[in-house]
């Protein structure tokens, strides 16, 4: 009976946290994309703007991917586990949004959300942004697992992963013959799908490189770099 009650309480806190995260996203979105603040706080109608729908639901999917891999430690009781889970979930959420903002600042610095999504309804831009958000979630999921509930290790690996992902986005123009900025402005889906496949492939490679015990950070960082260099050799 006690075990059943604990599961019910955990599920209640999980649902509550998920709802709070979805509500908080509206305000966090306005914080990161200041020109769109007034439109974000209004009611959302998916059928009115397909680009905005892709942009939003890719981020929701990213949150789901990360939350799906969070673990709950019941060693100190149900209430401490629930409190720890909520704190961890909130931290993960804001790290995720911050990561998206940083990576978009590197790859999409020539574009503005309000101009491309709200005004032009640029589906190519929304697709690139959405697939990039999912790629960030894939990498962060591996980071949180490698950190093993250690904040110190998390805040060492997190910037390291962003640097790797940022370098990856900058290298796209060297491995692709397509004009990224020009084709995004024209709304060409070819560049969106090409970049999406590229960033997803690299996100899986980077995530796989972090799947190891991170107790010795110097050896761990060297091991990650070695894995990535080996991946470059076999990556087409």
Predicted features and spans:
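Membrane-interface helix-loop junction between the first two transmembrane segments
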Residues: 23-47, 176
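Intrinsically disordered, low-complexity segments enriched in Gly and acidic/Ser/Thr residues
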Residues: 198, 203-236
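Membrane-interface helix termini and inter-helical loops of multi-pass transporters
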Residues: 72-80, 143-152, 180-181, 210-221
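Alpha-helical transmembrane segments and their immediate juxtamembrane interface regions
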Residues: 89-112, 164-186, 230-236
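Alpha-helical transmembrane segments
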Residues: 3-21, 80-97, 148-165, 219-234
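Membrane-interface segments at loop-to-transmembrane junctions
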Residues: 40-55, 113-128, 180-195
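Hydrophobic alpha-helical transmembrane segments in multi-pass integral membrane proteins
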Residues: 65-68, 131-142, 195-212
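Membrane-interface helix-loop-helix junctions at boundaries between adjacent transmembrane segments
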Residues: 76-91, 99-129, 145-153
């Amino acid at each position: 009976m006690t075990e059943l009650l604990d599961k019910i309480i955990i599920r209640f806190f999980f649902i509550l946290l998920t709802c709070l995260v979805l509500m908080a996203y509206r305000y966090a979105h306005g914080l990161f994309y200041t020109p769109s603040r007034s439109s974000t706080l209004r009611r959302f109608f998916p059928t009115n703007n397909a680009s905005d729908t892709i942009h939003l639901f890719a981020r929701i999917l990213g949150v789901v991917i990360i939350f799906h891999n969070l673990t709950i430690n019941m060693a100190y009781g149900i209430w401490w586990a629930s409190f720890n889970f909520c704190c961890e979930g909130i931290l993960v959420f804001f790290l995720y949004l911050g990561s998206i903002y940083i990576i978009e600042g590197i790859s999409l610095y020539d574009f503005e959300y309000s101009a491309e999504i709200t005004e032009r309804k640029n589906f190519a831009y929304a697709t690139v942004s959405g697939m990039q958000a999912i790629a960030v979630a894939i990498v962060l999921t591996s980071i949180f697992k490698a950190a093993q509930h250690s904040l110190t290790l998390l805040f060492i690996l997190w910037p390291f992963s962003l640097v790797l992902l940022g370098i990856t986005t900058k290298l796209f123009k060297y491995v692709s013959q397509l004009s990224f900025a020009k084709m995004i402005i024209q709304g060409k889906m070819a560049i969106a799908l090409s970049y999406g496949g590229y960033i997803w492939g690299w996100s899986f490679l980077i995530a796989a490189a972090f799947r190891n015990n991170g107790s010795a950070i110097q050896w761990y960082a060297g091991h990650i770099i070695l894995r990535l260099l080996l991946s470059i050799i076999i990556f087409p």
